[in-house]
Amino acid sequence: LIAPSMERELRAALTEQANEGAIRNFALNLRPLLMQPPVRGHVTMGLDPGYSHGCKVAVVDPTGKVLDTAVVYPTFSKAKRAEAIETLRRLMDRYEVTHIALGNGTASRETEAMVCELLRQKHGAAYMIVSEAGAADYCATPLAAEEFPQYDVNLRSAVSIARRLQDPLAELVKIDPKAIGVGQYQHDVPEKQLDEALSGVVEDCVNAVGVDLNTASPSLLRRVAGLNATTAKNIVAYREEHGAFTARRQVLKVPKLGQRAYEQAAGFLRVPESPQVLDHTGVHPESYAAAETLLGLCGYRLADVGALTELPARLEAYGPARAAEACGIGMPTLRDIVRELCKPGRDPRDELPQPALRTDVLELKDLKPGMVLTGTVRNVIDFGVFVDIGVHQDGLVHISQVCNKFIKHPSEAVSVGDIVRVAVLEVDEKRKRISLTMRGVPGDGETGPDCQKTAR
């Protein structure tokens, strides 16, 4: 009689443990994906490949504004392929496109070959494969229809793909985190627990980067601590009616945004147009007086912010503990203020390696055992790491091949989005499987065989 009861209890405990592990793994992979470095300052072309509906094309300016759209059919015939290449070349010339974001879905192999043929004629441009996970779901939502009422659902996905290269965080926050597809067993775990864990990760990432109060979308603003969907929409509506914000405190005039919400959100909101230089930084308004006092103690003024290269040395000479006491703050707050004053408006993503751009394509048949390649980590799961090496089929680095010493989980060595060097172990063309190793492969400053994980 007791055996079935014990079995149920044990099974329930193991299921709970497995659920927690799957949720933890998803959250662990989601953070580096959201924190991928943006590719700023470039006119970008987004391509959403397809067969029957064609390849959707969108050109966006450096701010993400749509400049032009088109639909080409490179898979229909040789004539249509030539016509597609000419259309893309004409768009690239007209808008001076330097970067192409190519979705990794249906027909991406044929489209990539076309892009490479185009880039042989257009020197100076490069492309990158971008995950289009969740793009189709987003483009059919009321949010996408509100943002792009004049565009067809299919064209919206091309815009989303282009923007994912320019600023992954700003675009991915519009998508349900579960649809991004960087976990394992996400459809088998309790949905409520998964939602709570992933929402927390998204909010942490948005708050770590900060948002520009005058350019942020409602999707981005609602992820800021203290704000919600209603106040985010009200901020955008106020901005459209009254023009750009010129001070942080001006956000208090937004309907339904009270003092308490302001106190929570203020440190994460940036106002580059403000005459108060501290509004450009992550220093909280409550710490403005302390920041000014600190500058005075070190022989600086507010006008010097942005050129405080000697601030850490001067603070060390004065005495950090003494300065903290004089400013009426604790040491952690002092360190935060110094970091923000030295790099006002800093974006932690800029300190990470830039995405790997390509100009040519590899085929599966080109791979040979022993070849050393550079790739991008696409997913980290319990038994290994999937790496995109540019052949339309991610290669697997088994956990035993990640580094030279024993590790309990691949996440101890790599994260989603890391640029890694791998060697080909085996290629099975028939089953389209690629076995890779990172052991003994000379590194390039990233994750080498000693498993020194890059801080994110």
Question: Where is each model-derived feature located?
Answer:
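Long, highly charged, low-complexity intrinsically disordered interaction regions
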Residues: 137, 146-244, 259-295, 329-359, ...
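OB-fold (S1/OB) nucleic-acid-binding surfaces
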Residues: 387-403
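Extended, charged alpha/beta regions that create polyanion-binding interfaces
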Residues: 1-40, 294-359
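Duplex nucleic acid-engaging cores and interfaces of nucleic-acid transaction enzymes
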Residues: 1-46, 50-151, 158
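OB-fold/S1-family single-stranded nucleic acid-binding modules
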Residues: 429-448
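Short aromatic-glycine-enriched beta-strand elements
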Residues: 382-387, 394, 432-434
